[in-house]
Amino acid sequence: MKLQRRGLLKAGLMGLGWTAMRGLAAASNSPTKFVFHVSSTPFGLLDWLRDRGYAHITAELEKRGFPSMLVHSSVRGSDTPNGDRASAVVKALQNVTNDVVIVGISNEGNYLPLVAAARPIRRVVYVNACIPRPGKPFIEVCQTEQVAVPGSYLDKLLKASQSITDDFLGLINDQNATEAHLKAMQDRIDASSSAHTLVGFYEVCPLKALPKVDTVCVSGSADDQIRPEWEQSAARRDLGVEPVVISGAGHGNIIYAKYAAELADACVKGL
């Protein structure tokens, strides 16, 4: 179905993919660069404020000899935010010859493997992040596994969107579904404040398998949105790595001053 393929096409896996191969010979002489995606605000007016949220972690990476890059793009009104974010990152890296580490926090985890499938990546870092399942939307993972912390904002969004989720999952598995059906479902998702807030959860991961790339998964022990137990279990099962647990770190504050040094250490270890 087109709903399942559009993320793949928008991520540029066949178009922009491998452009960076031209500069790989020079990469060994350049420091590894860390890349974060930042969702742009309307007209970019408050992008500077969102950028400040990354100041502590990027400063800690810089102390360790690793430059950082913030890639801005908007996902407002997008049917395929994961694919769009991946496409923006791949495009931004076209002329970058450094080795690259991409870092995803929270729902950003859903776009990371799309970038790794499109161009050479030195390392992928999931931070309190969704770990996508090839061939499935992340919302389906949330139905079969206890991803959200009970009573959390994420949990409330999932429960408020349940009827839409049920219909969506039924539709994408219906071989007789038409483009009109898919469009109507997307309109329902966009019109629902709860479902719309679950950015990228209703987008089917177009990959057949997660790319084989060096991977780090960092879990804050006090994450109040994504259950640390789920994050750590999924890291072992789906990513094949032992998660790094930062004691006391919550869902969003893990990149701020108190925990930034520990996070940076986890990100750069072994590079």
Protein language model features and the residues they cover:
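N-terminal export signals
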Residues: 7-27
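Active-site loop/oxyanion-hole signature of alpha/beta-hydrolase fold enzymes
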Residues: 70-101, 141
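Short, surface-exposed "cap/lid" segments of acyl-processing enzymes
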Residues: 33-61
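Catalytic histidine-centered segment of alpha/beta-hydrolase-like enzymes
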Residues: 249-258
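Conserved alpha/beta-hydrolase
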Residues: 56-78
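Conserved loop-alpha-helix segment in the C-terminal half of the alpha/beta-hydrolase fold
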Residues: 222-246
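Flexible "cap/lid" loop of the alpha/beta hydrolase fold
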Residues: 126-156
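Short beta-strand/loop motif that positions the catalytic acidic residue
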Residues: 217-219
